Amino acid sequence: MQGQTKSVSFDGREIKLTTGRFAPQAGGSVMIECGDTSVLVTATKSSGREGVDFLPLMCDYEERLYAAGRIPGSFMRREGRPPERATLISRLIDRPMRPLFPGWMRDDIQIVATCLSLDERVPADVLAVTGASMATLMAGIPFQGPMAAVRVGLLGDDFVLNPSYREIERGDLDLVVAGTPDGVVMVEAGANQLSEQDVIEAIDFGYEAITELINAQKEVLKESGIKQEMPKAPEIDDTISTYLDKNCTKSISEVLKNFDQTKEERDNKIEEIKISISAKIDGLKDDNAVKKSLSLNNKLLENSYKALTKKLMREQIIKEGKRVDGRELNEVRAIDADAAVLPNRVHGSALFQRGLTQVLSTATLGTPSDAQEMDDLNPNTDKTYIHHYNFPPYSVGETRPMRTPGRREVGHGALAERALIPVLPAKDTFPYVLRVVSEVLSSNGSTSMASVCGSTLALMDAGVPLKAPVGGAAMGLIKEGKEVRILTDIQGIEDFLGDMDFKVAGTEKGITALQMDMKITGLPIETIGEAINQALPARTHILGKMLDAIETPKDNLSPHAPRLLSFRIDPELIGTVIGPGGRTIKGITERTNTKIDIEDGGIVTIASHDGAAAEEAQRIIEGLTRKVHEGEIFPGSITRIIPIGAFVEILPGKEGMIHISQLSEARVEKVEDVVKVGDQVTVRVREIDNRGRINLTLRGVSQNGGMSNYPEPTPTPVAPLT
């Protein structure tokens, strides 16, 4: 079971593609490896199902914790529901693959990528995307590939190909680009306010590298004796489409050119035309070719009518430069933005509306212990900024069961989250964990970018000192032959009937996130650059409208938000603060009614709704961690008495003991003869033993009162002379 292995030298690393060895019953399989990262990707096709009028493509990325030498933390010690990271990588595979299958395909296709070994220097996601293309080609599935993906980072002024996790964290760019010989089909990126030109150059840099991986796949196919052939598309009966073209073109065009109507009015009129033509067909004789054609496929009318509407809308944009709502190609819809739309029990809130797209965003401030722990293969184990995106059915006037968030919700939330990360305050100056929730109240395109805008406003309303506000817009594209038109701020119908959805988010300074999906087999870098540059004035306009709602972050937090104190202690003294079995820190939290978090590096964060209580907890911890030296004198309070001495709290939470022999210059029979609990005394540190215990003394130390019965020294009796 050796199989065939093709090695590609790729930017100083070796990428291996092994076929014919693993998963022999899958339609096609490849083990793609780089360093110690290994991903098995399979592609399998089954025959289509009756009545399906779309491509039922399933892309799944599976993580196994054994890949990193770990055992799952669940009760059953087994991987459970896919983590968010796996969902995002599944989408990353799906997005460049889907447009490369022929439009007529209706067979079930499943691509499964399983990470079997993970090298922290080599992320698995881009390998999985490239492997998906190779496995599909090996399976002989009709596919307009090969396709490959790479990651591009930016360290200083230099682009880095397929950077490690550490390099991604240190760099100013994390960009994934996927492409075919025809051009770029997918882009996903997070950036630290980079200029448009820098991002365009990064995409170009990545696309050039893709060529090597595309050629390697072609060589594997050749060595395996597999010929890549695209079957002819099934013949489509054009009787219905010809009939609709003749009978509906004029009426649909009139609706699309009426710019004074609302979306609802336009949709209703287009639906009325369809109902009318359907009734007209029903009235035809049974032997009429149109009626006979429709009787063989009852979905033919619906599909042909959609295709005609799509064609007419696209022609109007290409030939007349006018969109269905009357906007120019580079025009943004009307914007309305408000901050503090909910009572201040919600720490921050905002309502952002662009056209018929409306999003309510809320911001909540939490303590470090509220960070989200990530039980996946990502080396970063927790998240301190979380964005959740909700898309209820009423937002598009529909009814359906309310279930857990799907892949789309997870993906949109992650994009909006990524857009804000570069402008969040540093952890050491603003140690809060932040959660933003974006509720889509109405959707007509670009809800993810509306969530970016709403998130910014909600965080500013919550008093989060953002480095800069972030806004975003979705760009679209219509391509007919050599004619290309780029659309700014696309609405729902333009997204559905167009060729591209390109979301660009950023500040006035530069881009923080972008995501491009295509419905065609590739786009040249020049066109992508044009779209990115056209998004800049739109973003500037949107940011201006946002700043009209709230110009700067609020100076004060909501009275219902926790107050945090953050300071650093010696990491070696963390155990002292925690105490045996956590007793010390538990005692502090109960005494002060606070919440305390301590990081491994010694950063202590105290949370409380009462500022004085937080300061008291800080005073206690600083007392516990303050080093005491022999000879120092402290005022203190007697806390407890034992037969051989008394304990004194000399610093908050730190006690020392006065041995009975150190209570007085004179002999003391009982400790209670000198001191009692609650007495205020002044003590000197006599010694600190090898176990760190503090031994105190009262001898030779001036007292300022407060002791119960401090005896004066008496002379030692002298034995009589004999």
From Swiss-Prot:
Disordered: annotated span: 700-722
Enzyme Commission number: 2.7.7.8
GO molecular function: 3'-5'-RNA exonuclease activity; magnesium ion binding; polyribonucleotide nucleotidyltransferase activity; RNA binding
Membrane-crossing segments per the record: none
Top-level lineage group: Bacteria
Necessary cofactors: Mg(2+)
One Pfam family named in its UniProt record: RNase_PH
GO (cellular component) term, any one: cytosol
Entry keyword set: Cytoplasm, Magnesium, Metal-binding, Nucleotidyltransferase, RNA-binding, Transferase
InterPro entries for the chain: ExoRNase_PH_dom1, ExoRNase_PH_dom2, ExoRNase_PH_dom2_sf, KH_dom, KH_dom_type_1, KH_dom_type_1_sf, NA-bd_OB-fold, PNPase
Record field: compositional bias (Pro residues): 712-722
Major place of residence: cytoplasm
Binding residues for Mg(2+): D495, D501
UniProt entry tagged with the keyword RNA-binding: yes
UniProt-listed HAMAP family: PNPase
Protein's recorded name: Polyribonucleotide nucleotidyltransferase
Organism per entry: Prochlorococcus marinus (strain NATL2A)
Gene: pnp
